[in-house]
């Protein structure tokens, strides 16, 4: 039997917004398996939608820029948000975006080797890290290119916590930016329903089929109910099916059709996606409530 620690309960609560005892019970039932515990809570309707499973956990900043037919988006991480707002960190952030846009490196190794005024980009990162006293890393970047018939939409949100690039055809810059703003706010995972991997759909279906509220309903009724829920699940994940944030009930697809535009791709960065933070004092608070 795995030991159910306060830290484990805390992590599950952060991912699902479940209560302390619900989280502890799910972990006990699944012998401490985090993914299975999340599924158990979803089946019982205790967990929030899957968005909570992707809690942001690191500090730093994103940046996005464009010039001509090229756009670049980057994420630079620090250990604290205090350093992320430091002038030297911000100067490094903008320098990094600028040289990556200019040089279009193939990977992180090539990006860090880009020559700058004083040595390489990596040298600048090390120097800024030494000045701030914190580890600073270039976590990721993307360079996107377009043709003359295409339009970029670039947008940064929450002071650089989120950045987005959209690539549209037959679009003006206002429409492209509006879509980028929508993506920043709503965080779609995929462009369309068809882009959602089959295993993601099947996994969600298996959870919904076990949902407590379906009870002893006949299988054919269960299938219809689950089909409806899967439709809503896919609409939440797929950009084109989401209600457009600046519209009046229309979907993103309907808005784009009205504008005569087509979206080809998008990239959304949010600081710290998928990075584990160090444990905070909240674990101690959870322990007190569990052991009460």
Curated annotation (Swiss-Prot):
Coiled-coil boundaries: none
Any one GO MF annotation of this record: translation elongation factor activity
GO cellular component: cytoplasm
Annotated CDD domains: UBA_EF-Ts
InterPro entries assigned to the protein according to its UniProt record, in alphabetical order: EF-Ts_dimer_sf, Transl_elong_EFTs/EF1B, Transl_elong_EFTs/EF1B_dimer, Transl_elong_Ts_CS, UBA-like_sf
Database matches in PANTHER family: ELONGATION FACTOR TS, ELONGATION FACTOR TS, MITOCHONDRIAL
Protein name: Elongation factor Ts
Source organism of this protein record: Oenococcus oeni (strain ATCC BAA-331 / PSU-1)
Lineage: Bacteria, Bacillati, Bacillota, Bacilli, Lactobacillales
């Amino acid at each position: 039997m795995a030991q159910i620690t306060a830290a484990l309960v805390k992590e599950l609560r952060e991912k699902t917004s479940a209560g302390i005892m619900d989280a502890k019970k799910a972990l006990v039932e699944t012998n401490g398996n985090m993914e299975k515990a999340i599924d158990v809570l979803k089946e019982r309707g205790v967990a929030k939608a899957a968005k909570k499973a992707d809690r942001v956990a690191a500090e730093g900043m994103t940046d996005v820029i464009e010039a001509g037919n090229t756009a670049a988006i980057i994420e630079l991480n620090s250990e604290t948000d205090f350093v992320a707002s430091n002038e030297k960190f911000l100067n490094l952030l903008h320098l990094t975006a600028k040289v990556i846009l200019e040089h279009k490196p193939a990977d992180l190794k090539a990006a860090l080797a880009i020559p700058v005024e004083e040595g390489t980009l990596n040298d600048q990162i090390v120097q800024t890290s030494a000045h701030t006293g914190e580890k600073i890393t270039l976590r990721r970047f993307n360079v996107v290119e377009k043709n003359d018939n295409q339009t970029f939409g670039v947008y940064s949100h929450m002071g650089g916590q989120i950045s987005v690039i959209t690539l549209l055809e037959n679009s003006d810059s206002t429409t492209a930016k509006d879509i980028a703003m929508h993506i920043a706010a709503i965080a779609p995972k995929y462009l369309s329903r068809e882009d959602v991997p089959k295993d993601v759909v099947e996994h969600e279906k298996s959870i919904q089929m076990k949902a407590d509220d379906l009870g002893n309903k006949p299988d054919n009724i269960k299938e219809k109910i689950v089909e409806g829920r899967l439709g809503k699940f896919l609409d939440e994940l797929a950009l084109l099916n989401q209600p457009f944030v600046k519209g009046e009930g229309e979907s993103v697809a309907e808005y784009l059709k009205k504008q005569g535009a087509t979206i080809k791709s998008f990239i959304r960065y949010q600081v710290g996606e998928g990075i584990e933070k160090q444990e905070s004092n909240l674990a101690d608070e959870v322990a007190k409530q569990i052991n009460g």
